[in-house]
């Protein structure tokens, strides 16, 4: 191979090693003595060690290594057969990357190796070092680079030991470890195949204290290594130990563990190797010493295998005898190749191998057939192994030459095929060292010896090389034993041929050694370690003596070793004594017993499982391949068939296209006719329904006007019938017309099975689709028609009777005719009549005819001509035609036939009757009385039957009605009893609460504080007011009763309520006691305060009527009502009661709460800790006010990032519950979001006082902030809110429960009572009576203090509220009407009455209507538009890169380009262009412009005289030179010249205006008629006055009409630059640029610039020399100019909205009067539009909405307050309505109002609050006649509700408040529907509600709806469970807690892992903390509805 170092080597000869050119060839020796002949089975030449140029020096160093000490020498021979020094130490192959470390088995830690080979970095991993990189040919080629070694050829040459310690041929590795090395990651403890290095220094050798086993094994080294496994063991020049893993002798075969085991030594070896690998433990040489000599085997096994082992041993000896040189053969070869000199082989110092062979070699028998070709790394020390291991890995049987097997293969059958797959690591291992050829293997072949051994030619017994060396292995192993007879081959299992490894037999000479070792080392069978030798089989007992002579081996030419001079080298031989010693040692080794083979059952089972798995894999691969082949074949055939199918389809289409087209057209025509008929039917039904409804209304009117009850019932029945008819007609209209299904597909699913086609066919059967009592398509005959027919028959009969009178009523036959006629269509089912077996009337003869007709109808589609056409397409079309006929036409024809038949039959019957009467007329005279009697009897019987049936039916109906009434009454009674019980329970709960409130109210005197006022008018009104009735209950002084918590013990069914009253009293007392106890014990641990007197706050009962003065710490003066509020708050604190300060907004709730904290710090020395929780927008406001009012307080602003808050938490003092003045902080201010985020830290603190600002944020008891704050350890809580009630009573309950959890959470019924919303409570009664109002107000009074501005603040004027109504514009009306047309009135009524859960669709309609009312541009914005530009523009990657001044060049070009070749454009293509290639360029100019030109001066001069051609020039004022120049100038130049030429003739008309000079014209200008009559000079001198207007009438009219300022009505669809000629020539580009960018032409068109004109004036250039003015006229459109880009008009933007137009007028007036405006919006998009409007009007403004950051909010508010030039403040209603002081504004405008009046009240109180000195005016813009009017009406209703509940007074209507406008929460659709409906529709909704309520259907429907909603809500879960009306109404609007600030969420500092808080990412009120806990850490952004709901506290986060 070219990448290996080459040396002078002898090429290998054919058949020199006995392989006949097949298999691995032996190592060819280089120049030097001829090597001895190899063994008959072929020498294993080492192809792994090429000789490099630098190998000589290292080889000499290795040879000159000092001999080891005796301890080492005693163990060195142990590795004779396995340890071989490197041939020149070329490359050291290492096992793993851990090659620089050695591992001690006793202490498996890495130790640095003291010896490292210089080339060790080129090592290859061990698992692949022994694998041949190439095929056999490559192996043969590689042989030239290898030296023949004794071990490599299985010769007797003794190799030196490895440098890391002794190796033993008795310590082979397990195949499982080998398998692991080959197929898994490299083991760091496995040695690599590398040349053995020189012996290490003595410090690395084994200590002499460890003795070998039986004197044969070397002592274990100090740094033992892992046992190295190998399958078979053989010697190679690169092998250092027999314990080295052979690791895949060839890539052509699988590892040994792959092959099937057999009951042989090979099977046991394989199982041992596999089992040892599973253990995974380190090898312990001490344990191996005892386990190595164990086990026994029957002697018959030894007898059976003796012959073959003898043969193997003889072969070994003969091969070794031919190589008796002590390792000098390969060494000499290497050195010779390196030095290129002939050298004397005997002048060298003995090598380490020679040294080892001369010391105690009689004690180290060697089995050369078990050597490995893999060398251990230089830094590994292999532990001494037992000799039994060598026998457990038997030598391979020499394969016959005819097999051609590889010597190093371990496969049972050795083939020469290339490897099926090579591991990438193997390839990398092969190529790791390009100079190393040691990648082959020298393992003995383990193939089965299926061929008889007789084919092997015996070797010669006389070998001259025996005398070469006495101590050589050739003399030791060679003997004269004859070759044993061949062993019978075992039968091969055809399934397991490739899986069974070969057996290897052992010699019998090891029996003595086994006994000897048993004496020295007893066996330890219970050793827990997993040992390779433990599981091996014992040596067979019977063996043939080793001294027997074998048959002569076949003659093989063995190359003789040669000396330096070329003469043959004499071989050394062993003495007889040494040979006898060696033979005895080998006998002792072979007689050693092996473990029993039964111990390998588990390994056998595992091997079989792997074999089965491999077989399954192969089968699956074959199956996949077969499937792939089938699929490919199918695809090919399908392509072929597809061609034929396509051809057939095309041919069929060509043949049948015309017929199919005609059929389709006819079908479409028929369908159109049917559609028209359906529409006619629909219109008739609608008209009939309208008529019926009118009849119903008339009947109802008559019923209401009727006086008699019977008459009223009659009219009511008529109305009911009409109503039923209307309902039926409506149902028909909704479900469609029942008939042929023309509009439904044929394969639409049918719920009853089958398809729609079969379903329709069943429905379309004749006889089943006919209506009840219908004979045909004609309408049923009325009674009058029938009576007329009867009268006609009677008249005919009378005429026949010749005047004889017939009886007055002859009904017998008439009745029979009637029955026959009406019953005939019903008796189509003959089978039914047969089953009933009833007597048939004379109508029976008609039945057979009907049957015949039906049979014909069924058989009609069967046409015999159909059988002639068998094509599929024809049959499909044919079947479709007949199917359509059967579906549509057959039924119609059948009905026509039936009608015709019935008419004919009726006529025939009548004729027959008349005929019979005429025939029997003579009998009538005698039988007339009898027949009359019979007829009357039949009629009477029929009437009686009808009467009794009707009577029975009425009785049955009455009975059912009575039963139903009884059930209804029972249900009502049960409901009444339950209601009474619930009422008593509710009364008990309310009484308990009332008692508690009464006791507290007496102490804290809330009523007195509320009534206090400083307004004189209010004081007078209070005096005149009648005091309310209050509870007069004495406080019990006796012992407190037991608290009742189990309500099941109370009897709520009893009438006596004394027990309940007593229990309520006890519960109220216990609640008070618990509150007081909690207040006492809060600071009990460290409270050392004054415990005497009235000021002891820990004794709440001792507080008297003490007036508290204003604290001195407070740097402001409190007003009187604020001081009373302070007293009330202190009183609450003393009693341990929490409260709600609900003063109206703007009355100073903040300063009152600050004064409480100052009072506690001043009086009781309680400086904290105080906690203030406020919305994010008011945090800075709180901090500023606390610092301003109480500077002594240390305020800790707790917000910022997670890291900032972590630092702030260091100031917390959790050890003390009461802070002193020197505490780190006194008041902490934070937001609701951070409280939830860092709830774990807040709950660890004990807070003296917690103040919640804008407490409506916790109005939802389901929100996480409510739950978190409720769990804080606080002595007192104070809620600040200006609107305690916002939507319903459930929110109020949430606040009350928060301040008193022990009372208001006493039972679930109390919560349910509040949550049911008192507005809709009281047994479906919508009136809340006075008693309930008073009791509710009594509950609220003690805990809530509320004052309004008009009572307490006389200097604050009232606010004036005005509703400004606006009209819809034309565009708004069109859009509003379009939306209204999309609303179904019926759906609206149904959703409003039934409470459907689908509120999103209705609210979406509400949002659309609101957008229309606000501005139409909210739907579709009129943006800047331009036509489609059909061109290309240049682009730039970044304008920033272009700089501040960007040069925009003309880069536009059309997408259409006219490309011309350069040949046409430049190279002579254009004939008039001169050039090198154009020889005719000047012809046109020469002849046409010069010679043939008639305009030359010479020709003109000659043609001037007389009447010649140019005689007219004398009258045109033109010279012949001017005419010549004009003919040679282009059109543009002539136009410019004419524009600069002065018209003197027109001025003559102005100068000479006398009559005689009127028509004067100079003679030389007689032809200048236009110039003479030009009026332009006259118009130019008369620019002003009436004359100027008359002279410039077009210009003045155009300017006055404003056409130039109008917007363009039409715009072009597209625009494109001119098409350019493209040519690959620079001249073409220059020419095009000269045309497009002609500077003189542009100068003439556009005139001089302003700078040039200025320069002309400054330079005083005379006007005559001025450049010509701009010839390009001014554009007609002043704004649009010459461009087609249209910009929307702001004027239209204002006028498109009625609100904006009205606001425009209002703002102009306010601006003139000096007002400042707060403008509130519900939609942020409307704020965006308003910004554009304000910019258009040049109004200064600022903006604040939910997206504004916290610091920006603060700065924006400060700017508006301090800068008067800012006219308008744009705010979002919900974002700008909390905690902002905007008193500098005196006008509030609501662009659109909120449906919740509380939101608007908060917004307007931003200006109407303390500090306001002006009159506040509030304007509401309401669009008339739209949804906004109804929303405003609903808001006023809610405002009344709140006023009544808070004040407790009566409403203006008296007798209670009408809450009919508010339904239950689950029917919020009614509110939305009432907004959408107009007055008439609202009336219909209420009427429908009343009807359902009276009938009882409303409750059923609502219950059903609630059940479905519960399931839906249960499935939804989480925060989507309850979506309030607020959330849907305010969709898209921001608010304060909507993010947009820089407060980051908690990160690593938050223990819950909650990140977020008040994050600025817009994630809502509570960052991502709880959201992450809910959703598992998802960072998905919340929707707008979720953020708004979180901000309001509606839903949990």
UniProtKB/Swiss-Prot annotation:
Biased composition regions of type Polar residues, renumbered to the chain: 89-107, 288-297, 318-340, 366-378, 433-442, 451-465, 472-481
Coiled-coil region list: 666-735
UniProt keyword list: Activator, ATP-binding, Coiled coil, DNA damage, DNA repair, DNA-binding, Hydrolase, Nucleotide-binding, Nucleus, Transcription, Transcription regulation
Protein name: Chromatin-remodeling ATPase INO80
Entry keyword Cell membrane: no
Binding residue positions for ATP: 1143-1150
Motif range (DEAQ box): 1253-1256
Leading EC class: hydrolase
Organism: Neurospora crassa (strain ATCC 24698 / 74-OR23-1A / CBS 708.71 / DSM 1257 / FGSC 987)
Enzyme Commission no: 3.6.4.-
Helicase ATP-binding domain boundaries: 1130-1302
Record's comment describing the protein's domains: The DBINO region is involved in binding to DNA.
GO CC annotation: Ino80 complex
Low complexity bias: start-end ranges: 49-64, 118-156, 203-230, 240-251, 411-420, 689-707, 794-806
GO terms, molecular function: ATP binding; ATP hydrolysis activity; ATP-dependent chromatin remodeler activity; DNA binding; histone binding
The keyword Cell cycle is annotated on this UniProt entry: no
Segments forming domain DBINO: 881-1006
Residue ranges annotated for the Helicase C-terminal domain, each copy included: 1702-1858
Alphabetical list of PANTHER family matching this protein: CHROMATIN-REMODELING ATPASE INO80 (PTHR45685:SF2), HELICASE SRCAP-RELATED (PTHR45685)
Catalyzed reactions: ATP + H2O = ADP + phosphate + H(+)
Function per UniProt: ATPase component of the INO80 complex which remodels chromatin by shifting nucleosomes and is involved in DNA repair.
């Amino acid at each position: 191979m070219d990448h290996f170092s080459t040396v002078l080597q002898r090429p290998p000869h054919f058949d020199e090693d006995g392989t006949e050119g097949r298999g691995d060839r032996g190592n060819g020796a280089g120049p030097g003595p001829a090597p001895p002949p190899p063994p008959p089975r072929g020498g294993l030449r080492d192809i792994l060690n090429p000789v490099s140029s630098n190998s000589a020096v290292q080889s000499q160093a290795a040879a000159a290594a000092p001999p080891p000490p005796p301890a080492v020498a005693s163990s060195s021979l142990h590795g004779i057969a396995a340890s071989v020094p490197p041939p020149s130490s070329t490359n050291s192959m290492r096992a793993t990357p851990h090659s620089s470390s050695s591992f001690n088995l006793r202490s498996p830690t890495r130790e640095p190796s003291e010896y490292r080979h210089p080339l060790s970095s080129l090592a290859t991993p061990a698992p692949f070092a022994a694998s041949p990189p190439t095929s056999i040919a490559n192996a043969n080629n590689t042989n030239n680079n290898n030296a023949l070694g004794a071990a490599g050829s299985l010769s007797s040459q003794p190799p030196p030991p490895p440098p890391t310690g002794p190796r033993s041929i008795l310590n082979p590795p397990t195949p499982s470890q080998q398998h692991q090395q080959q197929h898994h990651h490299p083991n760091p403890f496995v040695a690599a195949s590398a040349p053995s290095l020189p012996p290490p220094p003595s410090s690395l050798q084994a200590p002499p204290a460890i003795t070998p086993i039986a004197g044969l094994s070397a002592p274990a080294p100090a740094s033992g290594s892992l046992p190295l496994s190998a399958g078979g063991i053989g010697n190679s020049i690169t092998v250092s130990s027999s314990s080295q893993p052979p690791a895949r002798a060839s890539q052509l075969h699988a590892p040994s563990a792959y092959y099937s085991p057999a009951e042989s030594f090979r099977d046991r070896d394989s199982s041992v190797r596999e089992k040892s690998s599973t253990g995974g433990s380190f090898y312990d040489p001490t344990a191996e010493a005892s386990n190595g000599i164990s086990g026994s085997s029957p002697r018959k096994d030894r007898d059976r295998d003796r012959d073959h082992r003898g043969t193997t041993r003889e072969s070994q000896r003969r091969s070794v005898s031919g190589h008796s040189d002590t390792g000098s053969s390969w060494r000499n070869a290497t050195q010779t190749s390196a030095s290129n000199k002939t050298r004397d082989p005997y002048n060298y110092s003995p090598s380490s191998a020679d040294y080892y062979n001369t010391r105690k070699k009689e004690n180290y028998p060697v089995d050369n057939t078990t050597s490995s070709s893999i060398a251990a790394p230089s830094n590994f020390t292999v532990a001494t192994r037992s000799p039994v291991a060598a026998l457990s890995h038997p030598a391979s049987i020499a394969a016959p030459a005819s097999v051609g097997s590889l010597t190093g293969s371990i496969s049972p059958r050795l083939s020469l095929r290339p490897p099926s797959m090579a591991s990438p690591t193997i390839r990398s291992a092969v190529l790791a060292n390009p100079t190393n050829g040691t990648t082959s293997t020298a393992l003995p072949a383990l193939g089965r010896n299926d061929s008889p051994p007789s084919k092997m030619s015996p070797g010669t017994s006389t070998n001259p090389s025996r005398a070469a060396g006495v101590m050589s292995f050739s003399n030791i192993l060679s003997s004269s034993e004859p070759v044993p007879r061949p062993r019978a081959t075992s039968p091969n299992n055809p399934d397991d041929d490739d899986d069974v490894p070969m057996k290897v037999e052992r010699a019998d000479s090891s029996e003595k050694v086994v006994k000897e070792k048993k004496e020295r080392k007893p066996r330890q069978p219970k050793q827990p370690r997993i040992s390779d030798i433990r599981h091996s089989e014992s040596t067979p007992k019977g063996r043939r003596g080793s001294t027997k002579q074998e048959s002569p081996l076949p003659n093989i030419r063995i190359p003789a070793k040669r000396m330096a001079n070329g003469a043959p080298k004499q071989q050394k031989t062993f003495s007889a004594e040494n040979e006898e010693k060696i033979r005895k040692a080998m006998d002792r080794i072979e007689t050693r017993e092996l473990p029993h083979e039964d111990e390998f059952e588990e390994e056998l089972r595992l091997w079989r499982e792997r074999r089965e798995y491999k077989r399954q894999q192969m089968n699956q691969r074959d199956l996949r391949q077969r499937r792939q082949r089938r699929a490919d074949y199918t695809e090919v055939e399908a392509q072929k068939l597809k061609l034929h199918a396509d051809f057939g389809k095309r041919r069929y289409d060509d043949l049948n296209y015309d017929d199919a087209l005609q059929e389709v057209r006819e079908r479409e025509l028929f369908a159109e006719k049917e559609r028209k008929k359906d529409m006619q039917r629909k219109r008739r039904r609608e008209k009939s329904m309208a008529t019926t409804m009118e009849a119903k209304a008339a009947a109802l009117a008559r019923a209401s006007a009727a006086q008699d009850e019977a008459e009223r019932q009659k009219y009511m029945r008529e109305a009911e019938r009409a109503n039923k008819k209307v309902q039926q007609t409506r149902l028909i209209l909704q479900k469609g017309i029942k008939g042929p299904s023309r509009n439904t597909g044929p394969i639409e699913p049918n719920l009853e099975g089958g398809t729609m086609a079969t379903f329709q066919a069943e429905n379309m059967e004749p006889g089943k689709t006919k209506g009840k009592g219908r004979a045909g398509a004609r309408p049923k005959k009325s009674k009058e028609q029938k009576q007329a027919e009867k009268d006609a028959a009677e008249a005919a009969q009378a005429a026949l009777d010749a005047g004889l009178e017939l009886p007055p009523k002859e009904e017998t036959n008439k009745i029979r005719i009637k029955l026959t006629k009406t019953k005939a269509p019903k008796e189509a089912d003959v089978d039914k009549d047969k089953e009933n077996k009833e007597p048939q009337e004379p109508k029976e003869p008609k039945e057979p005819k009907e049957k015949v007709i039906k049979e014909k109808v069924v058989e009609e589609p069967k046409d015999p001509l159909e059988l002639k056409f068998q094509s599929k397409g024809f049959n499909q079309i044919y079947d479709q035609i007949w199917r359509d006929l059967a579906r549509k036409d057959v039924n119609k024809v059948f009905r026509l036939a039936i009608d015709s038949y019935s008419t004919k039959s009726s006529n025939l019957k009548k004729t027959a009757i008349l005929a019979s009467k005429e025939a029997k007329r003579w009998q009538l005279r005698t039988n007339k009385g009898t027949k009359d009697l019979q007829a009357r009897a039949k009629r009477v019987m029929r009437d009686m039957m009808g009467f009794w049936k009707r009577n029975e039916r009425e009785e049955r109906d009455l009975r059912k009605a009575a039963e139903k009434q009884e059930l209804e009454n029972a249900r009502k009674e049960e409901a009444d009893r339950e209601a009474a019980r619930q009422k008593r329970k509710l009364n008990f709960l309310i009484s308990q609460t009332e008692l508690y409130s009464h006791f507290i109210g007496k102490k804290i005197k809330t009523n007195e504080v509320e009534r206090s006022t400083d307004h004189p008018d209010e004081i007078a009104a209070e005096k005149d007011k009648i005091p309310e009735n209050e509870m007069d209950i004495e406080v019990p002084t006796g012992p407190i009763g037991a608290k009742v918590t189990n309500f099941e013990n109370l009897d709520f069914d009893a009438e006596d309520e004394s027990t309940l009253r007593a229990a309520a009293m006890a519960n109220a007392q216990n609640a008070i006691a618990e509150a007081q106890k909690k207040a006492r014990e809060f600071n009990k641990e460290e409270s050392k305060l004054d415990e005497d007197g009235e000021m002891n706050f820990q004794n709440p009962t001792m507080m008297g009527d003490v007036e508290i003065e204003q604290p001195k710490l407070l740097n402001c003066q409190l007003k009187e009502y604020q001081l009373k509020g302070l007293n009330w708050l202190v009183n609450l604190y003393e009693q341990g009661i929490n409260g709600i300060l609900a003063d109206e907004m703007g009355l100073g709730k903040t300063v009152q709460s600050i004064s409480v904290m100052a009072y506690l710090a001043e009086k009781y020395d309680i400086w904290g800790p105080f906690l203030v929780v406020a919305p994010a927008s008011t945090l800075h406001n709180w901090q500023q006010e606390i610092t301003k009012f109480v500077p002594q307080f240390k305020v800790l602003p707790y917000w910022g990032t997670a890291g900032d808050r972590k630092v702030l938490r260091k100031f917390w003092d959790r050890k003390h519950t009461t802070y002193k003045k020197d505490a780190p902080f006194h008041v902490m201010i934070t937001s609701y979001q951070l409280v939830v985020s860092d709830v774990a830290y807040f709950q660890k603190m004990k807070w003296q006082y917690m103040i919640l600002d804008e407490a409506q944020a916790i109005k939802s008891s389901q929100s996480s902030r409510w739950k978190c704050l409720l769990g804080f350890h606080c002595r007192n809580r104070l809620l600040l809110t200006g609107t305690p009630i916002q939507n319903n009573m459930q929110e109020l309950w949430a606040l009350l429960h928060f301040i008193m959890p022990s009372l208001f959470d006493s039972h679930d019924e109390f919560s349910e009572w509040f949550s049911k919303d008192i507005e809709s409570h009281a047994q479906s009664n919508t009136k809340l009576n006075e008693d309930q109002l008073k009791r509710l107000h009594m509950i609220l009074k003690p805990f809530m203090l509320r004052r309004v501005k008009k009572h307490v603040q006389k200097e604050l004027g009232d606010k004036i509220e005005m509703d400004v109504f606006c009209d819809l514009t034309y565009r708004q009306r069109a859009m509003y009407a379009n939306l209204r047309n999309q609303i179904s009135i019926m759906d609206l009524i149904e959703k409003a009455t039934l409470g459907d859960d689908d509120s999103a669709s209705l609210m979406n309609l509400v949002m659309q209507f609101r957008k229309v009312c606000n501005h139409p541009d909210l739907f579709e914005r009129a943006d800047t538009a331009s036509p489609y530009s059909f061109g290309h523009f240049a682009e730039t990657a970044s304008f920033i890169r272009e700089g501040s001044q960007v040069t925009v060049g003309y880069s536009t070009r059309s997408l259409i380009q006219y490309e011309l070749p350069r040949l046409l454009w430049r190279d002579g293509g254009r004939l008039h262009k001169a050039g090198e290639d154009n020889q005719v360029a000047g012809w046109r100019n020469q002849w046409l412009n010069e010679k043939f030109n008639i305009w030359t001066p010479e020709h003109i001069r000659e043609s001037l005289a007389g009447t010649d051609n140019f005689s007219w020039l004398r009258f045109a004022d033109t010279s012949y030179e001017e005419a010549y120049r004009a003919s040679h100038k282009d059109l543009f130049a002539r136009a410019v010249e004419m524009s600069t030429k002065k018209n003197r003739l027109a001025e003559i008309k102005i100068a000479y205006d006398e009559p005689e000079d009127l028509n004067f014209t100079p003679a030389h200008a007689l032809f200048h008629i236009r110039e003479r009559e030009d009026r332009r000079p006259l118009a130019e001198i008369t620019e002003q006055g009436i004359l100027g207007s008359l002279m410039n009438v077009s210009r003045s009219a155009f300017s006055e009409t404003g056409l130039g300022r109008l917007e363009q009505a039409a715009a072009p669809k597209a625009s494109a630059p001119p098409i350019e000629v493209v040519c690959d020539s620079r001249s073409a580009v220059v020419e095009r640029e000269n045309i497009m960018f002609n500077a003189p032409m542009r100068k003439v068109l556009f005139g001089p610039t302003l700078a040039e004109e200025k320069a002309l004036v400054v330079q005083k250039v005379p006007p005559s020399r001025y450049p010509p003015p701009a010839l390009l006229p001014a554009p007609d459109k002043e704004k649009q100019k010459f461009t087609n880009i249209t910009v929307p008009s702001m004027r239209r933007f204002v006028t498109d909205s009625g609100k904006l137009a009205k606001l425009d007028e209002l703002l102009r007036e306010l601006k003139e009067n000096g007002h400042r405006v707060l403008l509130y919006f519900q939609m942020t998009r409307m704020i965006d539009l308003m910004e554009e409007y304000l910019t258009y009007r040049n109004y200064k403004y600022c903006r604040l909405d939910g997206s504004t950051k916290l610091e920006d909010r603060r700065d924006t508010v400060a700017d508006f307050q301090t800068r008067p030039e800012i006219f308008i403040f744009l705010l979002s209603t919900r974002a700008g309505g909390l905690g902002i002081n905007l008193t500098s504004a005196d006008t509030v405008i609501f662009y659109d109002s909120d449906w919740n009046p509380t939101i608007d009240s908060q917004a307007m109180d931003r200006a109407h609050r303390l500090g306001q000195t002006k009159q506040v005016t509030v304007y509401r813009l309401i669009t008339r006649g739209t949804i906004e009017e109804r929303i405003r009406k609903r808001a006023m209703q809610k405002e009344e509700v709140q006023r009544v509940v808070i004040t407790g007074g009566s409403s203006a209507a008296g007798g209670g408040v009408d809450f009919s406008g508010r339904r239950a929460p689950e029917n919020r659709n009614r509110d939305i529907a009432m907004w959408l409906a107009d007055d008439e529709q609202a009336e219909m909704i209420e009427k429908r509600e009343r009807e359902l309520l009276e009938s009882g259907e409303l409750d059923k429907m609502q219950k059903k709806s609630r059940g479905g909603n519960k399931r839906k809500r249960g499935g939804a879960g989480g925060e989507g469970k309850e979506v309030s009306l607020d959330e849907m109404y305010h969709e898209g609007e921001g608010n304060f807690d909507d993010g947009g600030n820089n407060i980051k969420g908690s990160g690593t500092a938050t223990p819950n892992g909650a990140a977020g808080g008040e994050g600025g990412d817009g994630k809502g009120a509570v960052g991502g903390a709880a959201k992450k806990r809910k959703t598992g850490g998802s960072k998905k952004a919340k929707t707008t509805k979720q953020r708004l709901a979180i901000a309001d506290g509606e839903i949990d986060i």
